[in-house]
């Protein structure tokens, strides 16, 4: 899938933006806070029906405005044009349309335009709680497996209902707990099996990317932990019910799964330097891209937001070689350092566009300005 053109009104600090893109490489440079990340976030929104950084849609509307609109004009691998529209008014439900037809469920759109974003916010994958790492698995698997996304939605709905019962100060019949526990167990087993299969296939791809970027200087790994591996999920939930009632929420289940991120045999959260952490995160996301490309019917879009920060020159050079190669499709990349972008452009050749970003205004540079 190629994003040919984007139209943006009142999204974050972007008042009005109309841009045509290169099918290969699109570079955005400017100082921090000018709107580079917001442009990438608008592209992300068109794939995931939400912002990468702010889940509250109304807070993405430009200050003192009542709405935002994002429109993307794409071209599929077979040349078919696709138009995606998102509109949001304050105090109203957002609209999401494909070729002018509104989706009845936003989840039906997930995976239609596969996308991988690498950004500074990824540091939470290492530094943050286990929910960040579960979200990483969810974002990847949901883009190629509708059954997974449906099971995850069912599980979370049942989890909310069970937690409501656990908080109740009134006596609750066991049969009522069983209704939701059986739903959690059924959906949770699907989620567990698919997470386990994904991680098994993903690990060697991830290790290969890390090895290339670091030039074999360190070994890395991933391990997946789940209550569903230890026993039947239904039995786990039933056995935990008394303690859960005391706490007022569900202590066990696939919503507590963990993805351990390792440098050697130890948690990278504890052992990794800034450069090793950044290398780990970039390798994770590039492996995510490669995995989605292998499993899907279309090449994902790749968004790279300020990825060279905290990396030494040799690792920057390895990443430049990767993204300039033929393995990746359409790329959107931001940086405050024009030299980083110039090094990539030198390797890519002529198929690129360069944009200058200043105070929410984005302008394509003429060839003589580049």
Swiss-Prot record:
It is found in: Cytoplasm. Its main location: cytoplasm. InterPro entries: DNA-binding_RecF, DNA-binding_RecF_CS, P-loop_NTPase, RecF/RecN/SMC_N, RecF_2. Pfam families: SMC_N (PF02463). One of its GO terms (biological process) is DNA replication. It comes from the Bacteria. Transmembrane segments: none annotated. Keywords: ATP-binding, Cytoplasm, DNA damage, DNA repair, DNA replication, DNA-binding, Nucleotide-binding, SOS response. The keyword Transcription regulation does not apply. Coiled coil: none annotated. GO terms for molecular function: ATP binding; single-stranded DNA binding. ATP binds at residues 30-37. GO terms for cellular component: cytoplasm. Belongs to the RecF family. The RecF protein is involved in DNA metabolism; it is required for DNA replication and normal SOS inducibility. RecF binds preferentially to single-stranded, linear DNA. It also seems to bind ATP. This is DNA replication and repair protein RecF. The lineage of its organism: Bacteria, Pseudomonadati, Bacteroidota, Bacteroidia, Bacteroidales. The gene is recF.
